Amino acid sequence: GKEVLLIPILMILLGIGGTTFGMSEEVIPFYVMLIPIFFAMGYDSMTTFMIVFLGPQIGYAASTTNPFNVLIAQGVAGIHGNPQLVYRYIWWAIMMTVTIAYVMRYAMKVKKNPTGSITYQDDLLKKQEFMMDEKDTGFTLRDKLVLLVFAVGMGIIVYGILAHGWYMDEI
């Protein structure tokens, strides 16, 4: 029963990516990585799609420090700092809460009755495609290091924007 908690955790993390650095199409590989996990937990591909794509898009819509729209727009408007930051965080929290509730409601319905999924027929084929074989190596040290470097890099960008007022040149 606790696997359902993975939905809000992932959506919040991806939403933070959307709101801070404009994560958008960068999430496509996450779909491929997460779909077998969510299949194994009894969910459908639409649940995985909503988690991976709605999370960052909600973040992008309520951008806080996203250099691709907030910082450029504020620069063009001559606004220094980020005076609407608190409002944007509140708006992000409201939109994320509503979206997470919707996705969790859908996911629980599908888990209870898989044939009610709008992607049921397609998922039967996808489940065969994503079956693991003995050649799969799992999550290696190299994979962990790549994720660590990515996370540190994103953290540095967010820190630079918030603490030092970095703009496009510094990023």
Where are these regions (language model features)?
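Helix N-cap and loop-to-helix transition residues
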Residues: 2, 44, 80, 140, ...
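Hydrophobic transmembrane alpha-helices that form the pore/transport pathway of multi-pass ion
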Residues: 2-60
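Transmembrane helix-loop junctions in multi-pass membrane proteins
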Residues: 17-26, 69, 158-169
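Long, contiguous bundles of hydrophobic transmembrane helices that form the permeation core
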Residues: 85-171
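Membrane-core helix-loop-helix motifs of multi-pass transport proteins
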Residues: 36-120, 137
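Generic detector of intrinsically disordered, low-complexity, polar/charged segments
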Residues: 12-15, 19, 52, 56, ...
